[in-house]
């Protein structure tokens, strides 16, 4: 079963949450951000090139124009490959673990897997960000030395920064799977 809902990020931008239910013990959540706007790309490129042309008219050095074009292209490629994330995915399977995938605008993907045996809980935490209180979903990892301790806090959906209403949807589904996993692991 699959459904899609629209939410907002902390800045008011649009986000699309796709929920895929494969089984009672396996669910996937995909948060998609809007693609790179052609208008903003054109505005930045024109600004850099006009500034370079202004410097060219003052200095009469053609290397300034060539450098501006080269730097703009390198900057755009770097932004698309290392910064702009189009989609973040959280896949949770109660018998295996949690997989988080970030898909960049260039097509590059970054995946992290956490074994379910290392997961203590999934919670919604709050933080102060840019003079605002924001909420974020995070995975608490068990401390291998102390059974009741937490060794690490792993934030989820770091790039999309969804608002609380979206996080609650994901949180409830994750808690259902964690409860199912605990029930099956304690039953004889």
UniProtKB/Swiss-Prot annotation:
Instruction: Give any single GO term for biological process.
Output: protein modification process
**InterPro entries listed in its UniProt record:** GPI-GlcNAc_Trfase_PIG-H_dom, PIG-H
GO CC field: endoplasmic reticulum; endoplasmic reticulum membrane; glycosylphosphatidylinositol-N-acetylglucosaminyltransferase (GPI-GnT) complex
Listed A to Z, the keywords are: Autism spectrum disorder, Cytoplasm, Disease variant, Epilepsy
Any keyword Cytoplasm?
yes
Q: What pathway is it annotated to?
A: Glycolipid biosynthesis; glycosylphosphatidylinositol-anchor biosynthesis
Q: Does the keyword Transferase apply?
A: no
Any one Pfam family here would be PIG-H
The listed locations are: Cytoplasm
Effect the entry attributes to changing residue 103 to P: In GPIBD17; decreased expression of GPI-anchored proteins, including FCGR3B/CD16B and CD55, in patient's granulocytes
Principal subcellular localisation of the protein? cytoplasm
- What is the superkingdom listed in this entry's lineage? Eukaryota
| GO molecular function terms attached to this record | catalytic activity
Q: How does it assemble?
A: Component of the glycosylphosphatidylinositol-N-acetylglucosaminyltransferase (GPI-GnT) complex composed at least by PIGA, PIGC, PIGH, PIGP, PIGQ, PIGY and DPM2. Interacts with PIGQ.
What this chain does, per the entry, is described as:
Part of the glycosylphosphatidylinositol-N-acetylglucosaminyltransferase (GPI-GnT) complex that catalyzes the transfer of N-acetylglucosamine from UDP-N-acetylglucosamine to phosphatidylinositol and participates in the first step of GPI biosynthesis.
Question: Which disease relates to this protein according to its record?
Answer: Glycosylphosphatidylinositol biosynthesis defect 17: An autosomal recessive disorder characterized by variable neurologic deficits that become apparent in infancy or early childhood. Clinical features include learning disabilities, mild-to-moderate developmental delay, seizures of variable severity, aggressive or over-friendly behavior, and autistic features.
Similarity comment: Belongs to the PIGH family.
Q: What is this protein called?
A: Phosphatidylinositol N-acetylglucosaminyltransferase subunit H
The organism is Homo sapiens
Classification lineage: Eukaryota, Metazoa, Chordata, Craniata, Vertebrata
